Design a protein with these regions (language model features):
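Short, solvent-exposed alpha-helical surface patches in non-cytosolic proteins
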Residues: 155-214
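Catalytic cores of secreted/periplasmic lytic hydrolases that degrade extracellular macromolecules
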Residues: 1-155
Length: 214
């Protein structure tokens, strides 16, 4: 992995984790699509418009746009067309809009995918891209750069090992805050329900809550 590639993943990873907890898009898929669609953030669209995902502009969307040539695979051949693409104020705005796009009912199977391979296939099947090799290209990026490990991080934080030690009256609340990423278990996957919370830990919890609200 080059330094530029490492920096790009580090740039995308925090927001990718955040949108998983809020919108259920696997972080590996988010990062892999950003890599493919923006060529590691070096595409003209990424540089001029902060658009990492090749999301097109539509009338009434409330965004500015840039016009760029793009290739579409139609009737078994590649053709070049001029298209309008959304222009964002920041990279994070682009990531959030991508997550919102995947809330469309046609992407329901992407959000319910059990792993990155299924998610990669379903996002293509739902019409995100016309390239028939798109799923494999996503999977190759995820496996080459071990992006699935980020999925494992967020999923392990949800499956806490000592959930049976949580009082019945608190189980729903604990499940909700862990699922949303507001509170997580320790490195071994234990929630430690009876352990006291320090002021600095409380600050982290409140910060995560504020991020979800924002």
């Amino acid at each position: 992995m080059t330094q530029n590639q490492e920096d790009f993943i580090a740039l995308i990873k925090p927001e990718a984790i955040k949108i998983y907890h809020k919108y259920k898009v696997l972080p590996s898929l988010t990062i892999a699509q950003a890599i493919l669609e923006s060529d590691w953030g070096t595409s003209i669209l990424a540089i001029e418009a902060n658009n990492l995902f090749g999301i097109k502009w539509t009338d009434g969307c409330g965004c500015d746009y840039v016009v760029k040539q793009t290739k579409e695979y139609i009737s078994n051949q590649w053709i070049t067309i001029d298209a309008k693409f959304k222009k964002y104020n920041s990279v994070n705005d682009s990531i959030i809009d991508y997550a919102l796009l995947l809330q469309n009912p046609r992407y329901e199977k992407v959000l319910n995918a059990k792993d990155y391979k299924e998610a990669a296939f379903e996002v293509w099947q739902a019409g995100y891209a016309t390239d028939s090799n798109y799923p494999q290209k996503l999977i190759e990026q995820i496996e080459k750069f071990e992006l699935y490990k980020i999925d494992n991080e967020v999923l392990s934080s949800i499956n806490i090992k000592d959930f049976d030690q949580v009082a019945n009256w608190a189980k729903d609340a604990v499940k909700k805050v862990v699922d949303k990423g507001i509170m997580i278990g320790d490195d071994q996957g234990f929630f430690n329900p009876l352990q006291p919370c320090t002021r600095q830990e409380l600050a982290v919890i409140v910060s995560r809550l504020l991020e979800l609200i924002e």
